[in-house]
Amino acid sequence: MTCVNVCFFLFPPCHRNKITEADKSLVDLLIPSLCCSLAVFPSIPLINTHSNLCLFSNFSHSCFLFCTHPDTLPTSLSINPKKLSLSFSFPLSQKRPFPNFLHPFTGSELSLFRCLLLFFFFLLFFLSFSFSFSFLFFLSQIFIVYFSSFPILHFLFFFFLCVCVFLSFLFSLSHLLSLAILFLPLLLRVFSTLSRLPRLFCLCLQKKRRVLIPFAFTSFRKIASLPCVC
């Protein structure tokens, strides 16, 4: 992981001791907007629930610290506070990064999810194999009832039944592997996205609640001392 400081100047040096009402309104709008956009919008190469999206503020500038993968690190960053915009520049040979849905897993979450997937696929395998075996057993009962007077046919049918059971086992196993190959990435994406939503929702709420404090009762240094919620 590579951490990047994204800084932008809110106040010139002459405004260090005199913050105007326009500056207060700008900060009230800008800081929560960037907090939520960095955490939610997929166009930003941040999407990582375990990274530090921390706000560092003082009288001269505000900085956002966020982490990206080394191969998705932008070459330049620019922020326009007046338009509430944040732009990135990437190399021509590099594709625009998209969220890595597998990264938000911790070790314990990934181990638990793998156990659940293993149980789910074994359950599918058991159901598929039991259905095939039950169908063949039903056929064998019909055969025994209608052809009980031919012993040689009993032996042939028993051999045929063993072959069919083995083939059904192979078919169930191949079906299980194909399901795992096809649906495992999708299930991982769905699970990681669902696990991400409450954190992102709380992140936005807590950022807005902790940052949007009336400037008559606090200061930038008090805002800077607030704990990070990411």
UniProtKB/Swiss-Prot annotation:
Mode of membrane association: Multi-pass membrane protein
Membrane-spanning residues: 27-47, 118-138, 150-170, 172-191
Entry protein name: Uncharacterized membrane protein C17A2.10c
GO-annotated cellular components: cytoplasm; nuclear membrane
Signal peptide span: 1-16
Keywords of the record: Cytoplasm, Membrane, Nucleus, Signal, Transmembrane, Transmembrane helix
Subcellular location: Cytoplasm; Nucleus membrane
Source superkingdom: Eukaryota
Species of origin: Schizosaccharomyces pombe (strain 972 / ATCC 24843)
Key word rRNA processing present: no
